[in-house]
């Protein structure tokens, strides 16, 4: 049934053809079950494990590697002689890399899929219904409830479907809807129609929503919708429909992979074509086919050389280390790639309650009447410090601390706050904080009494557990609470009937203490309290009181005000009828006004500074709240989202105002606005969509089930540590301390991580460029192989992987939070950088080939061949006069390969030092700023020595131990790369950065 909240109870009953007393007949139940289906949320159709595994191989680079592995496997199969074993090493290693990558990928995907399952925990197991086949109420499984069923709910029950309330069987019905609306205060329900068909969930005061909890009272209602049609069901559908986008880094790496694969394909084809003439060379035994296969192997080597196999592992490691650093700052990251996305966040949409504020109501102002002279009335106004439930703070008058006990009016005000109250404070020893027990508003009054300490109780010697209610218990010993007149909507107040305790010999009789909404309570006051006397309440005095309340309720503070009053001579207990709440109004008449307290959910202390940080970093903060607009704007001014006198017409909207705008203007509003009030969860998703249309990277916070679709849609969903499991599973990050400042710290960390990733991605790629140049040069010049695939894999994975990982520990730049967020479209490698890589890569390639050639041409223990013989080695046979007196086997000697590999590794270690900073000289940023990097370079070199000097490794890698003169040559060839990069950095600093 649509818009049940706007229909009268009679209309709802006749729509389903049911009577409130008897319920549906078995026949109707059967028909409704067929029409509407069972009352449950369908299970999520997840991807099977096999589908997830296949998905991991959709990446182009992965496919090229897979192809290379298959080809080298086939080639290894046809290999003859002693090389058979070593030939299988390479395809085996490539496959291992691919499998490891796939496992990590599948594990991450699996985590993301659990969000929808978590919604299940809000489904109630059972429900209580009236049906025509039984006289009394019967308990049935919640999934069997159908629209039209008459359902009974009582305190502690979980609501089994979306229900329109027909009648309330207690004084009040309070419902905790925080999982749906995110607002922590429980809501008082009624049975009248809500005429507005477009009302937001917070305003549907005559509806009970599936999955919410009954906090107090008992009621009977008619089921309006079940299953997927309920509010929580709609949330599930939104979540199921939300596809996760790739993070900016994933998109970058995908683009990069595509470009790389095109380049690789081109180079492979080029190498093949250049050498078609050599296919028949005698070295291949004159067989064209074997010649083709030989160059095929070189093409495979090229593919292996060009792909940075170590990159996925290094990125994962760097992100994982980043998540550990963030966890120390209370930000728990659930999906690794989002660590980097945080770095380009340009908009943070934050909930107000609990994130920007403490979610601990606290009284910050109060007043009592000072004196009344005819129509002139003066007030004593006080402010109270402390913004949490901790009983620590002082009472100030004109900014100077005062003793509250000196003012008779404050003693009575404290008495009302302590007695007209069902809540208390509790010190949680495990968390080390004071927490509320009961309603937030009432706990604020309990805390106020503790701060006022009107009877000067000795509290310094008490433990924190005893301190929690010390001053309240003193007051509760003086007066005994007999009974409570519950809050009701018509009078907007509640009261307690108290009698003096036997022990106190004060000459006071019974009293009634009242607290409630100011207009309601003050209308029933005939007197005001001045000191210990009471004075008649005249029109001008009432106007004065109401004007202060109005001033407090608007403007910068927007406090929630409560009036406190006493009935000095209440009726006798015996004369009062306590089971008829309609009579409560008469008992709360003839009151004496005592004072007013103003409270708010105060902003967290650190938030103002964090918002300033965001402003410096070019990040816009948008506050989104279910609260009303006045309160929202006031908090925005307090924390610096708006300045004190800023005009907010185009920058703050309610959900309704936003909906009423045409679509184009809604989109425009999202570009300007910094505050949305009275919003529904669906608005959050809409806002994210509009922001994404401007290419903004949005971080969205949320804690309720209602926030899950928006959390899933935003690039960075941020759930609260105290939030629901659904919100946490739909988000990328969880704030352990629910604090907005933690988000800003995480953004800073994200920026630092991205900068470091840029450095090591560039480092790894320049290494690959060098390897490609090396293989291309040997093939183009017709030289013997300088590097074989298994050596390339070793370099890409191990020797380069360690320094690359260590580059993830580079310290962040000092001005990292003074720059605007980087555009997600900014390429990883810009034009100048591309030139730099090409220059460095070109040097690396030339140096490795040069080192191998040096051994052939000039080394003391080398064959001293001529350059012509070296470039035409393919034609070497015993019968060829050009190669007279030369053993052709020499062209397959391991020494030149060892020289080439050692030069490659040494240059890479120098390059790692170059990568400490993008443009800073090594003189300005010496190597020891990153001690991890020095350690990893030592480790990499040790591993290189391992494969040179420890059997059987040299055989597998086809290497030979080097002597001292050869190592000297390696260093001479390698070290100039540092000078080359310093020169390029110098040009960048002085001529390119304007």
UniProtKB/Swiss-Prot annotation:
Membrane keyword on record: yes
InterPro entries: ATPase_P-typ_cation-transptr_C, ATPase_P-typ_cation-transptr_N, ATPase_P-typ_cyto_dom_N, ATPase_P-typ_P_site, ATPase_P-typ_TM_dom_sf, ATPase_P-typ_transduc_dom_A_sf, HAD-like_sf, HAD_sf
GO terms for biological process, alphabetical: apoptotic mitochondrial changes; calcium ion import; calcium ion import into sarcoplasmic reticulum; calcium ion transport; intrinsic apoptotic signaling pathway in response to endoplasmic reticulum stress; maintenance of mitochondrion location; negative regulation of endoplasmic reticulum calcium ion concentration; negative regulation of striated muscle contraction
Subcellular location: Endoplasmic reticulum membrane; Sarcoplasmic reticulum membrane
Chain spans, region Interaction with PLN: 788-808, 932-943
Chain positions recorded as Ca(2+) 2 binding sites: 768, 771, 799-800, 908
Modified residues annotated as Phosphothreonine in this record: 441, 569
Family statement drawn from the similarity comment of this UniProt entry: Belongs to the cation transport ATPase (P-type) (TC 3.A.3) family. Type IIA subfamily.
UniProt-recorded name of the protein: Sarcoplasmic/endoplasmic reticulum calcium ATPase 1
The species this protein was found in: Mus musculus (Mouse)
């Amino acid at each position: 049934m649509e818009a049940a909240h706007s229909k009268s109870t009679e209309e709802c009953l006749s729509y389903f053809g049911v009577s409130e007393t008897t319920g549906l007949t078995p026949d109707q139940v059967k028909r409704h079950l067929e029409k509407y289906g069972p009352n449950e949320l369908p299970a999520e159709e997840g991807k099977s494990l096999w589908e997830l595994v296949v998905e991991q191989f959709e990446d182009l680079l992965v496919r090229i590697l897979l192809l290379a592995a298959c080809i080298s496997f086939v080639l290894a199969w046809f290999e003859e002689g002693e090389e058979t074993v070593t030939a299988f090493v390479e395809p085996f290693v490539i496959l291992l890399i691919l499998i490891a990558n796939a496992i990590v990928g599948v594990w991450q995907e699996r985590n993301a899929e659990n969000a929808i399952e978590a919604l299940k925990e809000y489904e109630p197991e059972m429900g209580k219904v009236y049906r025509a086949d039984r006289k009394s109420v019967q308990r049935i499984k919640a999934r069997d409830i159908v629209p039209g069923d008459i359902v009974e709910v009582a305190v502690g029950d979980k609501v089994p479907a979306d229900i329109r309330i027909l009648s309330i069987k207690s004084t009040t019905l309070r419902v905790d809807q925080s999982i749906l609306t995110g607002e922590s205060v429980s809501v008082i329900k009624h049975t009248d129609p809500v005429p507005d068909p477009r009302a937001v969930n917070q305003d549907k005061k005559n509806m009970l929503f599936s999955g919410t909890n009954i906090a107090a009272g008992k009621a009977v209602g008619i089921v309006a919708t079940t299953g997927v049609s309920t509010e929580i069901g709609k949330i599930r559908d939104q979540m199921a429909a939300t596809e996760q986008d790739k993070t900016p880094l994933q998109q970058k790496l995908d683009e990069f992979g595509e470009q790389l694969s095109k380049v690789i394909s081109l180079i492979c084809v080029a190498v093949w074509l250049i050498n078609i003439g050599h296919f028949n060379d005698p070295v291949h035994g004159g067989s064209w086919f074997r010649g083709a296969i030989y160059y095929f192997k070189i093409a495979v080597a090229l593919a292996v050389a060009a792909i940075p196999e170590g990159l996925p592992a290094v990125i994962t490691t760097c992100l994982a280390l980043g998540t550990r650093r963030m966890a120390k700052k209370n930000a728990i990251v659930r999906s690794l790639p989002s660590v980097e996305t945080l770095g380009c966040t340009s908009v943070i949409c934050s909930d107000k309650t609990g994130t920007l504020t403490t979610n601990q109501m606290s009284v910050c102002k109060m007043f009592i009447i000072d004196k009344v002279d005819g129509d002139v009335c003066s007030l004593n106004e006080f402010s109270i410090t402390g913004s949490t439930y901790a009983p620590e703070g002082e009472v100030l008058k004109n900014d100077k601390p005062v003793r509250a006990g000196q003012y008779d009016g404050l003693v009575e005000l404290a008495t009302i706050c302590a007695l007209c109250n069902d809540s208390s404070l509790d010190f949680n020893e495990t968390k080390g904080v004071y927490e509320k027990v009961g309603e937030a508003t009432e706990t604020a009054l309990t805390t106020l009494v503790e701060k006022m300490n009107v009877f000067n109780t000795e509290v310094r010697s008490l433990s924190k557990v005893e301190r929690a209610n010390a001053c309240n218990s003193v007051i509760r010993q003086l007066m005994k609470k007999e009974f409570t007149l519950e809050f009701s909507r018509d009078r907007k107040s509640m009261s307690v009937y108290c009698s003096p305790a036997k022990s106190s010999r004060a000459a006071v009789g019974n009293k009634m203490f009242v607290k409630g909404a100011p207009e309601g309570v003050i209308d029933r006051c005939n007197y005001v309290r001045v000191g210990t006397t009471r004075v008649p309440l005249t029109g001008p005095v009432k106007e004065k009181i109401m004007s202060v309340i109005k001033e407090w309720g608007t403007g910068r503070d927007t406090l929630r005000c409560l009036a406190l009053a006493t009935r000095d001579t209440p009726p006798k207990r015996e004369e009062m009828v306590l089971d008829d709440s309609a009579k409560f109004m008469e008992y709360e008449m003839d009151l004496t006004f005592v004072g007013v307290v103003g409270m708010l959910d105060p902003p967290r202390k650190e938030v103002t500074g964090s918002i300033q940080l965001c402003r410096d970093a070019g990040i816009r903060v948008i506050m989104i709240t279910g609260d009303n607009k006045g309160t929202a704007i006031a908090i925005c001014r307090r924390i610096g989202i708006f300045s004190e006198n800023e005009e907010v017409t185009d920058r703050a909207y309610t959900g309704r105002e936003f909906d009423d705008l045409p679509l184009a203007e809604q989109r425009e509003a999202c570009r300007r606005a910094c505050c949305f009030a009275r919003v529904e969860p669906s608005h959050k998703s809409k806002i994210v969509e509009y922001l994404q249309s401007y290419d903004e990277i949005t971080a969205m916070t949320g804690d309720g089930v209602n926030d899950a679709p928006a959390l899933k849609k935003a690039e960075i969903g941020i759930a609260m540590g105290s939030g629901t499991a659904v919100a946490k599973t739909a988000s990328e990050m969880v704030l352990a301390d629910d604090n907005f400042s933690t988000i800003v710290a995480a953004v800073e960390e994200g920026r630092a991580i991205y900068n470091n990733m840029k450095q090591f991605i560039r480092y790894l790629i320049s290494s690959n460029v060098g390897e490609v140049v090396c293989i291309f040069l040997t093939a183009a010049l017709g030289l013997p192989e300088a590097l074989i695939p298994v050596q390339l894999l070793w370099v890409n994975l191990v020797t380069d992987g360690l320094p690359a990982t260590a580059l993830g520990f580079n310290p962040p730049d000092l001005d990292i939070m003074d720059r605007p967020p980087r555009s997600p479209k900014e390429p990883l490698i810009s034009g100048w950088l591309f030139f730099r890589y090409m220059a460095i890569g070109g040097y690396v390639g030339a140096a490795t080939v040069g080192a191998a050639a040096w051994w052939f041409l000039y080394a003391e223990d080398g064959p001293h061949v001529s350059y012509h013989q070296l470039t035409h080695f393919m034609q070497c046979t015993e019968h060829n006069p050009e190669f007279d007196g030369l053993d052709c086997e020499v062209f397959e000697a391991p020494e030149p390969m060892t020289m080439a590999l050692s030069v490659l590794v040494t240059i890479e270690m120098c390059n790692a030092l170059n990568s400490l900073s993008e443009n800073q000289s090594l003189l300005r940023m010496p190597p020891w700023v990153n001690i991890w990097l020095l350690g990893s370079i030592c480790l990499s070199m040790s591993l290189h020595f391992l494969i040179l000097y420890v059997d059987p490794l040299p055989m597998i890698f086809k290497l030979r131990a080097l002597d001292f003169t050869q190592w000297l040559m390696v260093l001479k060839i390698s070290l100039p790369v540092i000078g080359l990069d310093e020169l390029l950095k110098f040009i960048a600093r002085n001529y390119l950065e304007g």
